[in-house]
A protein has these predicted regions:
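Extracytoplasmic beta-strand/coil segments of soluble accessory domains associated
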Residues: 38, 55-97, 114, 134
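Short acidic/polar hinge/loop motifs at secondary-structure boundaries
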Residues: 93-120, 138-141
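Periplasmic-side early beta-strands and strand-to-turn transitions of outer-membrane beta-barrels
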Residues: 152-291
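Face-selective signature of the C-terminal outer-membrane beta-barrel domain
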Residues: 200, 257-279, 293-418, 429-431, ...
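C-terminal beta-signal and adjacent terminal beta-strands/loops
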Residues: 214, 546, 594-609, 634-694
Length: 694
């Protein structure tokens, strides 16, 4: 007899169309089979591209997503909506501790992420309040190997040297030392699989130095007749003195997470998890204090499969977040913020009926906040406010035939504060062949006012008041989208047009009375957002891949006033080159992000000489377009050591306009061109090699 040799060729899924996603439907299915448009970012690819943190990765890779520097920190926006409408999840679970909807994004360890799933549009049917604009679900790693250990370190140029050689005897020694922390990162990711038990542990430390950003010219305000029809003409006011520099805080933080999986039988699986996060924020204000944040999360999840009929999953998730003011010279700190959420959930999923994927769930959310910002005085008295909601959801994904799929769902919400609400959704996917897919979607979203928007009454250093409004109602929106995509072995093209129509939209508006600025929350009547998005992924050669995204959004004005700060145009592009031979890999990535011109209006007061009196009026902010470009080159030796060199902001773009008056405009917080070096070790491969030699 003669032996027949067979050669098997494995083809890499360059475009990621066979990747399994869960966010769009809460059930696992290949991305190309999902009726809901989902963008997937691989965690490994984001690290290889040289991104230092989640913010940088999302801004570069996601069309229409923007993270800018504003007065209170970082502000994220997507498709013309701010962070209050973008729901961040970690393995499908909510987090607490936000400021104006923005979390401490430093909590997210990029090296612990397996993939990021992004679903745009209203997803309130499955995820409830705050999912009216988008859901960003970070899926963390779970090792499949007996042993997996990766470790690395990254060092970057300082943003700015503020103090030279501070001495311990100096009165401001700790302030000066903290302001000039090194730009340093280190991480370890370790996992093992032994029989029915799988463990995954991840730890990440990062520090960065504080720096100043400077405005090239004096403050200027232009009050236009377009925004203020009562004015006799456009009025320009130029400040006689230069604007003080904007201080960008330095940060030092560490996060550690642990997940433990136990699968005693094929029908039963158990997950227990926990994480902790500590962060110090070092500003450039010499007040002998700095901010501290602390977060603990914990939870458990149990899934049981009843034959092939259905699966039952019960889970309990909790998150506890605290913020302190810490003294630099004395070992004391005062708590000024405490937030917690408890979220039990029960879901039942079934594929028993032919062509149908059903999910039913009930969840309860208990949200509690203790802060010194409810009292409205300077005594910093701590008060507690709470919101509780119970929600039910049902969804069916019906595969009618190989070409048609329909998804329909309904979520009901009941809270003591706002009563009963219902949110339907329906999505359809038509695939005439393997290369083309057309998706249409309608969904209703809602967002209940947050505790801050309802109850805040805070005097900000005597500069202005932030006031909540207990009479506000939940905002509602109707989201429509129509998209098409084409793919072959080397090319993926996707385009989506959407409309998002809000009523009773919750916004913060500036009003001036009692001789000071007041920032108040209120329900606007209506707001309309129309947009287009396009995505390209082209495997030009076996070694070369081109990626590109473009986003356009048009936001309606409110009585002729544009309060939305989003740029109509945004785009990203990257070129990825790979070279591989035995025991060596080279990867080079050049990326660019474009942000278009921004024009919006800010409320103020202006003196009109002709009338010899002052009026409430809006001045026009006009911020220029810009491009940020990055380059990274990595080399991997023997699949054990990887060395990466990179340069961020190659062309040294620095914003020239930071704000006007007390208003800080949303600008990129960059000091200019900075280089970095990164070294990674695949320790499990090193250990396996040593074992083989023995």
């Amino acid at each position: 007899a003669t032996e027949t040799e067979k050669t098997v060729y494995l083809e890499e899924d360059h475009l990621g169309l066979n990747e399994v996603v869960v966010t769009g439907s809460r059930t696992a299915r290949p991305i190309k089979m999902s009726p809901v448009t989902t963008q997937v970012l691989g965690g490994k690819q984001l690290v290889e591209a040289g991104y230092s943190n989640l913010q940088q990765a999302l801004q570069q890779e996601t069309p229409g997503l923007n993270i800018q520097k504003v007065g209170f920190g970082n502000e994220i926006s997507m498709q013309g909506l701010d962070a209050r409408h973008v729901l961040f999840l970690m393995d499908g679970e909510r987090m607490t501790g936000d400021m104006a909807g923005n979390l401490d994004y430093e909590r997210f360890n990029l090296h612990a992420i397996d993939r990021i799933e992004i679903v745009k549009g209203a997803s309130s049917t499955l995820y409830g309040s705050r999912a009216a604009g988008a859901v960003i679900n970070l899926i963390t790693k779970k090792t499949t190997k007996p042993l997996s250990i990766d470790a690395g370190v990254r060092y970057g140029q300082m943003n700015e040297r503020n103090y030279k050689n501070p001495q311990p005897k100096d009165f401001l020694y700790m302030f000066e030392k903290n302001a000039d922390r090194p730009n340093l990162q280190g991480w370890v990711s370790a996992g093992f699989k032994a029989g029915k038990v799988t463990s995954q542990t991840d730890a990440w430390y990062s520090s960065s130095d504080a720096f100043y950003m400077y405005q090239a010219e004096n403050d200027k305000k232009v009050y236009t007749q377009e925004a203020n029809p009562f004015l006799p003409h456009d009025i320009t006011v130029v400040n006689s003195s230069s604007r003080p520099p904007m201080g960008i805080e330095g940060k030092e933080h560490i996060t550690v997470s642990q997940k433990l999986y136990y699968d005693p039988t094929d029908d039963l699986s158990v997950l227990v998890y926990g994480s902790t996060f500590f962060m110090n924020t070092y500003d450039l204000i010499q007040d002998m204090t700095f901010s501290q944040a602390r977060d603990w999360t914990a939870g458990a999840k149990l899934t049981y499969h009843v034959k092939d009929w259905f699966s039952v999953t019960g889970s309990l998730h909790a998150d506890f977040y605290d913020r302190f003011k810490r003294h630099e010279r004395i070992d004391t700190r005062n708590k000024d913020y405490e937030s917690s959420i408890w979220q039990p959930r029960l879901t039942i999923t079934s594929n028993y009926f032919d062509g149908h994927s059903l999910i039913f769930g009930v969840e309860h959310t208990s949200d509690e906040l203790t802060s010194d910002r409810f009292s409205g005085n300077a005594n910093h008295d701590l008060k507690t406010r709470a919101l509780k909601e119970t929600e039910y959801f049902l969804q069916d994904e019906w595969t009618i035939n190989p070409k048609w799929m329909v998804s329909a769902g309904l979520r009901t919400n009941f809270s003591k504060a706002f009563g009963f609400m219902g949110m339907p959704k329906i999505a359809a996917k038509y695939s005439p062949n393997e290369r083309w897919s057309i998706r249409a979607n309608y969904s209703m979203g809602y967002r209940s006012p947050s505790i801050k928007e309802l109850f805040f009454n805070w005097d900000h250093l005597g500069m202005f008041m932030i006031r909540g409004n207990e009479n506000m109602q939940p905002e509602k929106n109707n989201y429509f989208s129509l998209g098409a995509e084409y793919s072959n072995d080397r090319l993926f093209l996707s385009g989506t047009a959407y409309g998002n129509y809000f009523r009773d939209k919750i916004e913060g508006v500036w009003r001036i009375y009692d001789m000071q600025y007041n920032f108040e929350y209120t329900n606007l009547s209506k707001q309309r957002l129309l947009g287009l998005e396009a995505l390209l992924r082209w495997h030009v050669l076996d070694c070369l891949t081109l990626n590109g995204t473009y986003s356009f959004v048009n936001v309606s004005k409110n009585e002729g006033i544009q309060v939305n700060t989003t740029s109509p145009h945004a785009a990203t592009a990257s070129l990825d080159y790979k070279f591989t031979k035995k025991n060596y890999r080279l990867n080079a990535v050049f990326s660019a992000s474009y942000m278009g011109r921004k024009k919006f209006d800010v409320q103020d007061r202006v003196f009109v000489e002709e009338d010899n009196k002052s009026y409430d009026a809006y001045f026009r902010c006009d911020l220029p377009q810009y491009v940020l470009c990055n380059l990274s080159v990595s080399q991997t030796f023997y699949n054990k050591v990887k060395l990466t060199l990179g340069v961020d902001n190659i062309f040294n773009y620095v914003p020239k306009t930071l704000g006007s008056g007390i208003t800080m405009f949303n600008v990129p917080a960059t000091p200019g061109t900075r280089g970095w070096v990164q070294l990674e070790f695949m320790l499990d491969d090193v250990i396996n090699s040593l074992r083989k030699k023995k």
